[in-house]
């Protein structure tokens, strides 16, 4: 390999232009710019150290970059207008260049050095980048690209989306009770994934009944079908229009998740939320849907002044709140479980944690735990079982 020609080729990436912001390019570029043998040795070992920090296989680093890159070609491919032949030819040419980098061995860089001792090197493996990338393009609506290919749950800050590195591992299989509520949300989500008409959903009910866990478990179950979750706090509602617009051309499906949604009288976000649910502030998009949870059926925190006002004012407030809740289209109620359901949930968790208690002992202890704490709920059931597992481990 002629290293100078290879270096020049690496300077011609347009589709994969973000390569020039990658740590790998920073290390390679330093090597190519080295003039003395000492500089070459230093930059070469810096490159090796970086590759080692990523697992020691240069091929895998290049593959991760190519498969996760978010570029203009993908956006064109997703648009109804289709892709441009000129850009496609550039993409193919650049993949051939990156294939050379994928296969680059350490000896190719240090073979002309006069250094007489052994130098570090890295691993490579055989793979066809063009074939791998074509498979990714064919599955964009399920696998996504960029950070959406690496993560499936996100939060929002002033700089944009922040991946959740360690998302809640809650699974549908581990959930007991509330089958009717859970199935209603699953069916709505499946319709959404299939591009059918689906409703924004409000999960209303007592604290600890599994509203948020249900949403996260559904996303975990269908992430491989292209489902992603973006958690937005109530204080960030003003960012929703721009967030939804930014997702407009993304091939994946997004649940905008707002936990513990509620408003106070005169809250400016109340009107904005109502407008968003009506589709008035952003285009009607088929790839975003809003799922919210609340402990208040009509989403409004009622102050003492509200209750002390006139009946007309009080009724107007209730009607206004009800009008927002009705915009969700699908309202699912999660009530605190009765004793029998609570015990079924406890037994489900006890089996998962392999507790060594008879059913009668389990029921007595679980009921006592609920009385001492926050009453019967799926959350209380899990807390009891986790506590009991600790007790057993200490005996």
Regions found by a protein language model. Give the residues of each.
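Conserved P-loop NTPase mechanochemical-coupling segment
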Residues: 169-173, 212-235, 301-302, 394
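AAA+ P-loop ATPase mechanoenzymes
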Residues: 1-174
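C-terminal alpha-helical "lid" subdomain
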Residues: 335-395
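Walker A/P-loop nucleotide-binding motif
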Residues: 178, 195-215
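Conserved catalytic/switch belt of AAA+ P-loop NTPases
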Residues: 264-311, 316
């Amino acid at each position: 390999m002629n290293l100078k020609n290879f270096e020049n080729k690496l300077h011609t990436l347009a589709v994969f232009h973000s390569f020039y912001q990658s740590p790998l390019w920073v290390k390679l570029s330093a090597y190519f710019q080295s003039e003395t043998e000492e500089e070459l040795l230093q930059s070469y070992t810096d490159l090796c150290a970086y590759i080692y920090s990523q697992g020691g296989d240069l091929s895998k680093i290049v593959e991760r970059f190519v498969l996760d890159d978010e570029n203009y070609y993908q956006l064109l491919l997703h648009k109804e207008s289709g892709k441009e032949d000129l850009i496609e030819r550039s993409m193919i040419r650049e993949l051939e260049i990156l294939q050379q980098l994928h296969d680059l061995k350490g000896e190719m860089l240090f073979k002309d050095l006069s250094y007489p001792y052994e130098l570090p090197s890295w691993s490579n493996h055989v793979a066809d980048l063009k074939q791998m990338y074509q498979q990714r393009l064919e599955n964009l609506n399920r696998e996504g690209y960029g950070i959406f290919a690496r993560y499936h749950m996100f939060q929002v800050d002033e700089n944009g989306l922040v991946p959740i590195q360690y998302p809640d591992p809650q699974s549908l299989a581990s959930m007991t009770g509330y089958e009717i509520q859970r199935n209603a949300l699953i069916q709505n989500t499946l319709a959404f994934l299939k591009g059918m008409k689906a409703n924004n959903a409000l999960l209303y009910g007592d604290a600890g009944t599994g509203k948020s866990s249900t949403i996260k478990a559904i996303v975990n179950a269908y992430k491989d079908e292209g489902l992603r979750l973006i958690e937005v706090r109530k204080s960030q509602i003003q960012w929703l229009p721009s967030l939804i617009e930014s997702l407009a051309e993304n091939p994946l499906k997004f649940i905008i998740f707002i936990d513990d949604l509620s408003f106070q009288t005169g809250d400016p976000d109340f009107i904005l939320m109502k407008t968003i649910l009506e589709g008035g502030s952003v285009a009607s998009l088929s790839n975003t849907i809003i799922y919210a949870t609340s402990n208040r059926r009509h989403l409004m925190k009622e102050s003492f002044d509200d209750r002390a006002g006139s009946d007309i004012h009080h009724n107007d407030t209730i009607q206004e709140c009800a009008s927002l809740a009705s915009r969700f289209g699908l309202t699912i109620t999660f009530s605190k479980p009765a004793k029998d359901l609570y015990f079924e949930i406890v037994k489900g968790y006890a089996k998962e944690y392999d507790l060594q208690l008879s059913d009668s002992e389990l029921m007595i202890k679980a009921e006592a735990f609920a009385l001492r704490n926050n009453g019967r709920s799926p959350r209380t059931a899990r807390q009891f079982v986790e506590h009991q597992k600790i007790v057993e481990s200490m005996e």
